[in-house]
Swiss-Prot record:
Cellular component, GO, one term: cytosolic large ribosomal subunit
Species assigned in the record: Caulobacter vibrioides (strain NA1000 / CB15N) (Caulobacter crescentus)
UniProt cross-references to InterPro entries, sorted A to Z: Ribosomal_protein_uL29, Ribosomal_uL29, Ribosomal_uL29_CS, Ribosomal_uL29_sf
Molecular function via GO: structural constituent of ribosome
The protein's name in its UniProt record: Large ribosomal subunit protein uL29
Family the UniProt entry places it in: Belongs to the universal ribosomal protein uL29 family.
Cited PROSITE patterns: RIBOSOMAL_L29 (PS00579)
GO BP: any one term: translation
Length: 63
């Protein structure tokens, strides 16, 4: 997910996206632990997307 995409979202959309990413991260962690994950790079992508969303949410809350 690109940062420009994230900045264009409303805080409600960001919160919804954050929840869905956390669920996906949870599922991928279990798959990784059992050795079933096929796209291992997706774990890092999701982690970084979560960080980006949290950063934008904080910036919007401060503004």
């Amino acid at each position: 997910m690109k940062i420009a995409e994230i900045r264009g979202m409303t805080p409600d959309q960001l919160a919804d996206t954050l929840i869905s990413l956390k669920k996906e991260q949870f599922n991928l962690r279990f798959q990784a632990a059992t050795g079933q994950v096929e796209k291992t790079h997706r774990v890092n992508e999701i982690r970084k997307d979560i960080a980006r969303i949290k950063t934008v949410l904080r910036a919007k809350a401060a503004a």
